[in-house]
């Protein structure tokens, strides 16, 4: 049971109406001069003064003064400074006295902070940045984590190369632990979410399949905003597991406008290889300048188009092939969404359905995801002091032929990068097996990546439920209390097959299954207050709350290393069990 309590104070600001003061009438010849002050009359040092549409500019000095030469009458003078409204004034030849007003939109910007509390950004005592939902839709990323790339300072996104839906790693302000566990806590609508959904061991030598992380389950269309909390304050609010920071996700609610609103959207995107590894294109297969059709190196004779005998005994003219480029396809991502928003008096309802299909650049690798969301919120009671909010979200993810990680022969990337450059990978695309049912490949080691697609396939499915509900009561305009409950649960099933004829299992086949069950329940209460001008111009806020978390995870892996009847994939068909 974790109890949290905190308080902070700060100045309450009174902001005058925006405007610009007048201009002294004293003729100057081609030099625009003046003074810049704020609403209190204090000089503004370092304000930018520029002729709009040009590079002719300067900054104000210690007394807020400036002098700008080569200015024509009628030119627009633009004055700006952080935290103030930008001013544009046409110059009529006289010195300028300019008053900058506070940018009330920036100072009064309300953001969603820890535990779902809304605060003015200026009053926060810790670093945080917010990204609006529209900005996350610009690139239409399969994994939501990738959409943060370049949008938040100090956030490093390490993208996965493991096909569609692969995990992406997030680090806030560098590495905080030598163990490598540096990822922030993910919180959706005030409820923590598990960002690790598991990996699976493949059949041959147990390399790993990346089955994606929690953020890859979230539909970007449902997001209102994402906030990034950095520093120790995140740990103070969410406990030790938030020591690496927190990413807060706020999802959409129904509109407050009367009537029914329908939004339909769709997108199509394509992906292809951008940067390919560079390999030497002078020498062919072999070593020490000598050709050898069984050698895996590319330091044989110089390639001049000479005739040679290939791995299959046929004769051809030697040439260099770009196997990396020739292996990958053009990936296509399709996404369709529809959402309904309905307002009934004081109750709003939001429903959305999204379908995403991703055909990877990797031949045979595919991912599909379906998101269904239902959310309702309402206010009731005297003066609408009571408010209730509830949401249920279901996500189904299906994947086929996720690429295998590790420096293993059944890793397509590893195989292609280590092939001799005078062997064409496309020669093995069809057929992939001979008349004896064995795999066609140029050497006795490694696996034909086209064979893996059909005869060493893997697939997995994940069903996830995200649920939360809250009840809030507002005692006064500055004091309220809230209780909240949330649950994150998912069920993952995986299957891997190895057909007879593979070089590591020529006579028999292999079959394995895996399953994982996970749930986390959170129950919390929070009493919070915020009041401006509590002591003169000073205001303050406080919060007191607690959280009870219940978490459980179970898993089961089964493997049949030698099937009695080849290619009959059943756990009952085998005489050897690898558990």
Task: Give the positions of each predicted feature.
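Membrane-spanning beta-strand positions in outer-membrane beta-barrel proteins
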Residues: 76, 156, 224, 259-263, ...
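Membrane-embedded beta-strands of outer-membrane beta-barrel proteins
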Residues: 66, 170, 247, 338, ...
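Short, polar/charged loop or turn motifs at beta-strand boundaries
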Residues: 35-39, 127-150, 158-162, 170-177, ...
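N-terminal periplasmic accessory domains that precede
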Residues: 94-99, 109, 144-146, 170-173, ...
